[in-house]
């Protein structure tokens, strides 16, 4: 979900847009992914996980939970990432993205994570384990776009397999 004001009015607009797409692409499903944000829009009235839940319920869509993005937002805006995960509807999380990257300066003191070119940090692994306590995603994607180190990736895939099974 792009950085938007988290209100019921925004939900209505997004739901309408998703339903238009689904009418054209019949028989398809729709996935929404959380982004990391440098700012929180004034006027937001709903927590992002509740916002996503509402969209999913109204459109039968599912969530791609990008754990590094969620972790960036938790650090930036002071919420508990485990409560965020637990607050997502049980059957809503279809896919997980994990990656390692750099923490970059965002707006004011806030940080964003960018890049898929480093090892996954331990806090992301811990949160992935927490996801599996509450959800059964169909897919987990380990993202790596450069600094390809085969041994490192194999180790991460082994760790991923252990967590997922």
What are the language-model segments listed below?
Residues 147-165:
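C-terminal helical cap(s) of enzyme catalytic domains, especially alpha/beta-barrels
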Residues 1-62:
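Active-site acidic/histidine proton-transfer and metal-coordination neighborhood
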């Amino acid at each position: 979900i792009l950085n938007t004001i988290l209100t019921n009015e925004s939900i209505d607009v997004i739901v309408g847009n998703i339903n238009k797409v689904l009418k054209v692409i019949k028989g398809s499903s729709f996935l929404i992914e959380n982004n990391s944000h440098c700012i929180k829009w004034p006027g937001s009235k709903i927590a992002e996980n509740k916002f996503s839940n509402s969209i999913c319920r109204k459109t039968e869509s599912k969530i791609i939970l990008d754990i590094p993005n969620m972790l960036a937002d938790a650090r930036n805006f002071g919420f508990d990432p485990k409560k965020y995960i637990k607050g997502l509807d049980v059957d809503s999380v279809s896919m997980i993205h994990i990656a390692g990257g750099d923490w970059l300066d965002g707006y004011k003191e806030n940080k964003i994570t960018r890049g898929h070119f480093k090892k996954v940090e331990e806090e992301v692994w811990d949160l992935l384990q927490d996801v599996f306590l509450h959800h059964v995603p169909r897919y987990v994607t380990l993202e790596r776009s450069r600094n390809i180190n085969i041994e490192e990736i194999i180790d991460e895939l082994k760790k991923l397999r252990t967590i997922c099974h």
